[in-house]
């Protein structure tokens, strides 16, 4: 199977490349600079340009493009950059893949975020059928996903991964969260009762490969633990795993003052479930918060 990656140098893209290379699969990547090897192809998504040769023989394209939501503050120009970087990469990838039709079955695995649903206001979980919220990040994910439509219209099988924070020591959220805990300064965020979506890197990589090889998989999938986990439960699991106490708490007011809107993503209650993955028979290797923390500390990149 031949794969094309956009965003291959980031945390998740690097993990995908390592996994696929270990299996002997063929991987080519899109770069914004002059290509340095025969496995690199240039593109400029902000200008809507892409080297169409990148799609030659490709079975699966994975689009992870987009600048990080951090750093703060979310100024108007930063908001525009966060949105444009996602919509432009997705639109350029989707239109290029659509224009390169060669009669073969092809798949686009498109990144998105669990932030589409906003915070939880009731006891019912968010599923893939739940409507998008109205806040800034929810609007970003809605436009992000819509930008992949040209590929679907051209007959490409499009799988949208609404991903929660992917936990692993090699990068992302967990790499930042574990540092204060290792120093004995870990803390519960807010009152700790808020549900906190997450998935291990090991399971994230498994979902990507499942999406690539499951011919009837299409549309959105929530990537989060099948068992809801609170921030306090995550703190307990991490404290136990690194043999450190949990006695500190960061009040919600301090977080809101320091982080502004982003604080809502950390102290807001988010209850989403991977309904479609479970219904389609996907089996999580790390279904509980204790499993996720253990896997993250071992670092799935080495697996």
Walk through the language-model features, giving the residues of each.
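Glycine/proline-rich active-site loop of Rossmann-fold NAD(P)-dependent oxidoreductases
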Residues: 142, 154-156, 167-176, 211-221, ...
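Active-site Tyr-X1-5-Lys
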Residues: 133-158
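N-terminal Rossmann NAD(P)H-binding glycine-rich loop of SDR-like oxidoreductase domains
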Residues: 3-23
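NAD(P)H-binding glycine-rich loop region in Rossmannoid oxidoreductase-like domains
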Residues: 35, 41-92
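Conserved Rossmann-fold NAD(P)-dependent oxidoreductase catalytic core, especially the SDR/UDP-sugar
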Residues: 91-135
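NAD(P)-dependent short-chain dehydrogenase/reductase
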Residues: 152, 159, 164-195
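Alpha-helical substrate-binding/gating segment
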Residues: 178-186, 194-228
């Amino acid at each position: 199977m031949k794969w094309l990656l956009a965003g291959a140098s980031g945390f998740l893209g690097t993990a995908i490349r390592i996994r696929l290379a270990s299996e002997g699969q063929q991987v080519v990547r899109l770069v914004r600079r002059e290509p340095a090897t025969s496995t690199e192809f240039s593109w400029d998504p902000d200008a809507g340009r892409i080297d169409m040769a990148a799609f030659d023989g490709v079975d699966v394209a994975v689009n992870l493009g987009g600048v990080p939501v951090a750093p703060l503050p979310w100024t108007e120009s930063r908001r525009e950059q966060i949105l444009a970087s996602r919509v432009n990469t997705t639109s350029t990838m989707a239109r290029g893949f659509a224009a390169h039709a060669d009669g073969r079955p092809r798949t686009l695995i498109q990144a998105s975020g669990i932030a589409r649903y906003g915070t939880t206001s009731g006891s019912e979980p968010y599923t893939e059928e739940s409507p998008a919220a109205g806040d800034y990040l929810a609007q970003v994910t809605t436009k992000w996903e819509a930008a992949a439509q040209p590929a679907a219209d051209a007959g490409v099988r499009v799988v949208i991964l609404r991903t929660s924070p992917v936990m692993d020591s090699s990068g992302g959220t967990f790499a930042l969260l574990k540092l204060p805990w290792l120093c004995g300064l870990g803390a519960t965020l807010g009152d700790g009762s808020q549900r906190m979506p997450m998935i291990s890197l090991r399971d994230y990589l498994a979902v990507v490969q499942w999406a690539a090889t499951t011919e009837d998989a299409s549309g959105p999938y929530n990537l989060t633990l099948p068992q809801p986990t609170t921030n306090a439960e995550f703190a307990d699991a991490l404290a136990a795993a690194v043999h450190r106490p949990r006695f500190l708490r960061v009040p919600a007011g301090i977080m809101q003052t320091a982080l502004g809107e982003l604080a809502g993503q950390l102290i807001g209650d988010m209850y989403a479930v991977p309904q479609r993955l479970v219904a389609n028979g996907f089996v999580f290797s790390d279904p509980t918060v204790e499993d996720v923390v253990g896997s993250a500390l071992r670092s799935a990149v080495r697996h």
